[in-house]
């Protein structure tokens, strides 16, 4: 939606400012003790060419954060945006060059996983930063270790997980509901920080779920270009099919789902009751929040 997009622009600016500030402080020469009277100075230098592999769900903020971190530490970057969002990356690099970043310091390669494999297999790449799924991160790690004659290549990987919220009887229900709706359903739940599992103390569970369902009834699903809408579509057909198949699988445990009045890749924001945490063994990257209860004192 438009608010999500504006928030991402602000986050991208924050990333650039943060790494610029860290560079001013951390990249300064450090004078070391000289026990025999000599002057010793520690200076940091860039390693060389870094490969930056960015996700589609924050195609501006995370992409620029990866690039900025590499540049301010004296490196050059070959950046591969997600195949779903190459234009956003290209526009952002155009802006970076207009702002004064040397054209040769950043290059973009577009494509899917096959392009990523070629990039990571190039011995000129001395470091890799990646944001995405755990299986892909493991595949990248194996790729970087496949060449026995290649020096070890650092890998910085930010991957997925199951974000949980524990709520006990001291919590303010209104605040809980607000946070669940924002974290679980904003950006159609397509954030690595999105809430996946809501754990409620049994004594307050019924009341909290009732309030949450009431808040979900106020959500409007539709065209993200319309500021009156709260929830937009998921990224592509594959994501839509995967999420809808899962919803069908747990249909008997759906507590509430937001109506979707239009056609398209719109997954209904959904609240699913869970009997066992063992039933949730993977991250469902969409507007689906699972709820379970726990007894006081445990």
Segments and roles (model prediction):
Residues 39, 47, 268-270, 288-291:
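Short glycine-rich loop/turn motifs
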Residues 1-2, 203:
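N-terminal alpha-helical segment of soluble enzymes
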Residues 6, 10-177:
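Rossmann-like NAD(P) dinucleotide-binding subdomain of oxidoreductase/dehydrogenase enzymes
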Residues 10, 83-86, 206, 210, ...:
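Alpha-helix N-cap/helix-start motif at coil-to-helix transitions, marked by capping-box chemistry
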Residues 1, 31-36, 226-231:
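Short linear capping/connector segments at secondary-structure termini
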Residues 95-102, 121-123, 127, 134-277, ...:
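ALDH superfamily catalytic-core signature
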Residues 283-286:
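C-terminal lobe/hinge of AMP-binding adenylation domains
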């Amino acid at each position: 939606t438009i608010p999500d997009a504006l928030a991402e622009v602000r986050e991208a600016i924050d990333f650039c400012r943060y790494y610029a500030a860290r560079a001013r402080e951390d990249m300064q020469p450090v004078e070391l003790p000289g026990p025999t009277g000599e002057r010793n100075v520690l200076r940091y230098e860039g390693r060389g060419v870094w490969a930056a592999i960015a996700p589609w769900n924050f195609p501006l903020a995370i992409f620029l954060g990866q690039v900025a971190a590499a540049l301010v530490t004296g490196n050059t970057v070959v950046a591969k945006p997600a195949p779903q969002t190459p234009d956003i990356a290209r526009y952002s690099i155009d802006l970076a060059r207009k702002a004064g970043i040397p054209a040769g310091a950043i290059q973009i390669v577009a494509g899917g996983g096959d392009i990523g494999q070629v990039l990571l297999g190039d011995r000129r790449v001395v470091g890799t930063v990646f944001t995405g799924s755990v299986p892909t991160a493991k595949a990248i790690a194996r790729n970087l270790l496949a060449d026995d004659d290649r020096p070890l290549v650092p890998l910085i990987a930010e991957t997925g997980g199951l974000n949980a919220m524990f709520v006990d009887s001291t919590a303010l229900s209104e605040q809980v509901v607000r946070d669940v709706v924002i974290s679980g359903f904003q950006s159609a739940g397509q954030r690595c920080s999105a809430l996946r599992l809501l754990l409620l103390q049994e004594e307050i569970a019924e009341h909290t779920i009732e309030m949450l369902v009431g808040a979900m009834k106020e959500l409007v699903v539709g065209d993200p270009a319309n500021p009156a809408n709260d929830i937009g579509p998921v990224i592509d057909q594959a994501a839509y099919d995967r999420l809808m198949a899962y919803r069908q699988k747990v249909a008997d445990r759906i507590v509430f789902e937001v109506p979707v009045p239009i056609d398209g890749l719109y997954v209904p924001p959904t609240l699913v009751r869970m009997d066992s945490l063992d039933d949730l063994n993977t991250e469902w990257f969409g507007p689906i929040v699972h709820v379970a209860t726990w007894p006081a004192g445990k």
